[in-house]
């Protein structure tokens, strides 16, 4: 028996078939180098985190940029985990379905296996964030520990992206199409999250993206509204030499602020005038986001099961 085929389906029950397929996927993790997604994900997380990690959860700008970048890492990891796992063995799935395989057992086994992968990737990502000097939020919003809230969010985002890619893998017929579709899914998640681009009349689309809910959750957990804002000060510094009727009023003001040790007070004041209700550190801003991500997981799972239910009729 090769690792691309399952054990003989001597059990007709869904639970027993679930165990058979889960063991198969675990063997493939070892013998077919599926473990490679872990170091690849770690490298991507390291590249991003070492660039934006120092200011994440320190300033409002750093938190916005850092959480969005971290969410993108999670989405990428999730997509890469499962975008090819079904379509690469589509013929085998079709054959075994005709022999009595339960599609629900097969999909749930994939989901259990992918959950293990996503959990490991979450631990690796948190470790890399720690090494990169990320200042984890100490008090949590949902739990007592901010790092736990952060870990739950990272796991949910990664897993939702993973199951979305699993759904796509069930819909397409080969790995070439799957890898062609994946960049478009990534672009959709990045652009339509609403975090960096003004969507205008299309703003309602952001609620359909995993990245939107993930970034918002991390900003809430990171206590965005309690952090200083530095962009106003940096803008004023750029214009410090601006001449106004032979005077440089901004330069005098900036020098006075620094001389009197009021810079930190100014940055905190700037932050307090840039509060966002959606980022207030309360459970009501986190739990709905987690719920939205879980709902997406349920929808992706349902579509994946339905798609494979009709695999016998697939003439492609």
Region annotations inferred by a language model:
Residues 1-12:
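Non-transmembrane, juxtamembrane loop and terminal tail segments
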Residues 10, 19, 26-316:
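Membrane-spanning alpha-helical segments of multipass transporters and channels
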């Amino acid at each position: 028996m090769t690792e691309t085929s399952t054990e003989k389906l001597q059990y007709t029950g869904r639970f027993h078939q679930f165990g058979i397929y889960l063991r198969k996927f675990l063997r493939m993790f070892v013998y077919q180098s599926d473990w490679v997604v872990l170091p690849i994900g770690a490298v991507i997380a390291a590249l991003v985190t070492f660039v934006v990690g120092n200011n994440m959860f320190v300033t409002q700008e750093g938190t916005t940029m850092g959480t969005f970048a971290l969410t993108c890492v999670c989405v990428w990891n999730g997509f890469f985990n499962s975008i090819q796992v079904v379509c690469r063995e589509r013929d085998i799935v079709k054959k075994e379905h005709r022999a009595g395989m339960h599609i629900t057992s097969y999909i749930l086994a994939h989901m259990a296996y992918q959950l293990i992968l996503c959990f490991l990737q979450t631990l690796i990502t948190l470790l890399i964030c720690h090494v990169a000097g990320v200042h984890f939020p100490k008090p949590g919003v949902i739990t007592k520990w901010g790092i736990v809230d952060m870990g739950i969010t990272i796991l949910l985002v990664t897993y939702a992206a993973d199951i979305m890619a699993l759904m796509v893998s069930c819909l397409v017929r080969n790995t070439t199409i799957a890898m062609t579709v994946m960049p478009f899914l990534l672009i959709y998640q990045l652009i339509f999250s609403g975090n960096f681009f003004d969507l205008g009349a299309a703003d309602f689309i952001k609620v359909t993206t995993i990245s939107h809910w993930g970034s918002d959750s991390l900003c809430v957990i990171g206590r965005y509204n309690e952090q200083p804002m530095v962009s106003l000060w940096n803008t004023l510094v750029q214009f410090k030499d601006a001449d106004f009727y032979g005077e440089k009023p901004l330069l005098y003001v900036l020098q006075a602020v620094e001389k009197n040790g009021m810079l930190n007070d100014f940055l905190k004041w700037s932050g307090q005038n840039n509060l966002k209700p959606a980022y207030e550190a309360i459970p009501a801003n986190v739990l709905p986001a987690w719920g939205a991500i879980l709902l997406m997981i349920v929808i992706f799972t349902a579509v994946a099961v339905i798609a494979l239910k009709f695999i016998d009729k697939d003439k492609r």
